[in-house]
Swiss-Prot record:
InterPro entries: ComplexI_49kDa-like, NADH_Q_OxRdtase_suD, Ni-dep_hyd_lsu, Ni-dep_hyd_lsu_Ni_BS, NiFe-Hase_large
A Pfam family of this chain: NiFeSe_Hases
Similarity-based family: Belongs to the complex I 49 kDa subunit family.
Protein name, per record: Uncharacterized protein MJ1027
GO molecular function, one term: NAD binding
Annotated keywords: Oxidoreductase
Domain of life of the native organism: Archaea
Length: 377
């Protein structure tokens, strides 16, 4: 009996159970194999850069934090760094250390969120809940240090907020909880790599080769999963990280497993950085804020940092009235999504959302641009 091939389109989203954030995925299929894919973003467009134009730098630092709830700290850190460099503002070393500690805690909770989401997409609910259970102590630590679990408001121009100063009496307890987190993470990693069902879904699936990754400018763990060194912390863009010993994690296979493995092992490196930072804090000067600064006019300057998903870029200048001009913000998800869109053809429909999830997309960070064609949005 002859069966005719089915050719058609499957539209997923913008709201779907496998999506943490809204986007629209169009899959053009032949039977159950993807022949072409189109990823549509922009559902959450809010025009952040336009809103920032003409505001004082103190206000845009608050606004930048609202760009994303998962990586809010890195946005504020980059934002205030532009003003600090443009106005030659000295930041106390203790403040820089605490900024880095909070960022690495944020990296841990973000990576654990991805693991939970990835297991959920795979259909392994038990592993998903385990990932979130391991993540919870990190959220509690962030809440204790900053007063918030999602919006931390830690960096300010010239330092950090007083409430975010880490008391030396709390350091031993924090180190103990980090050690427990590390033990639980090792168990989760061991359980993952030794489960043949999980590995069959993520090994040799969604392969992004090094050439394509370079061509489409993959960033962060997505690039490092394809053998590309891309960590801004190791490239001298964030001077405070020169005080810490840690490794840049790179895998060469470029598949879903490699992208997840980079994040797994990055968690151990983040714990290493936090541990060093906490142990060094008692030896640093007690100052956390430099109030003796003056805003001055400067042309747009560039600032880079390494967010959980890759390179974050901020640029703006101040006019003669101390108002922000020419704001540009670039987050890593846009180029990483282009990579995922390029490698979807040839895969089974059931692998589509998993492949996209493997680059850990943050659509809230990405949706700041809108396309206008013939005066129509």
């Amino acid at each position: 009996m002859l069966f005719m091939k089915y050719e058609g389109e499957i539209a997923i989203g913008p709201v779907h159970p496998t999506m943490l954030e809204p986007h629209r995925l169009r899959l053009f299929i032949e039977d159950e194999i993807i022949k072409e894919a189109e990823l549509v973003i922009g559902v959450n467009y809010r025009g952040i850069e336009l809103i920032m134009e003409g505001l004082p730098p103190e206000k845009i630092s608050i606004l930048s934090e609202k760009i994303c709830g998962i990586c809010s700290h890195i946005h504020v850190w980059c934002n205030v760094t532009v003003t600090e460099r443009g106005c030659d503002i000295e930041v106390p070393e203790r403040a820089e250390y605490i900024r880095a500690i909070v960022e690495e805690l944020e990296r841990l909770h973000s990576h654990m969120l991805l693991f939970g989401h990835a297991f959920e997409v795979l259909g392994f609910e038990t592993m998903a809940f385990r990932a979130f259970m391991i993540r919870e102590p990190i959220m509690q630590i962030l809440g204790e240090i900053t007063g918030g679990r999602a919006q931390y408001s830690c960096p300010i121009i010239g330092g950090i907020r007083p409430r975010c100063n880490i008391k030396e009496s709390k350091i031993p307890a924090l180190l103990e909880r980090l050690e427990k987190f590390e033990e639980n993470l090792k168990k989760l990693l061991e359980r993952t790599v030794n489960d043949p069902m999980i590995m069959s879904r993520i090994k040799d699936v969604g392969v992004l080769d090094k050439k394509t990754a370079k061509k489409l400018h993959a960033l962060g763990p997505t690039a490092r999963g394809s053998g590309i060194h891309s960590d801004m912390r190791k490239m001298g863009q964030v001077p405070v990280y020169d005080n810490f010993e840690f490794e840049e994690i790179v895998f060469d296979d470029g598949d879903v497993f490699s992208r997840l493995a980079v994040r797994f092992y990055e968690c151990f490196e983040s714990v290493k950085i936090i541990r060093q930072g906490l142990k060094d804090l008692p030896n640093l000067d007690k100052r956390i804020y430099n109030p003796n600064y003056e805003l001055k006019e400067f042309k747009p300057i560039d600032v880079y940092n390494e967010a959980q998903r890759g390179q974050v870029y901020y640029s703006y200048g101040l006019d003669e009235n101390g108002r922000v001009r020419q704001v540009k913000i670039r987050t890593p998800t846009a180029t990483n999504l282009a990579c995922m869109e390029a490698i979807l053809p040839g895969h089974h429909v059931s692998d589509a959302e998993l492949i996209i999830a493997s680059c850990d997309p943050c659509f809230t960070c990405t949706d700041r641009m809108i396309v206008v064609k013939e005066n129509k949005i």
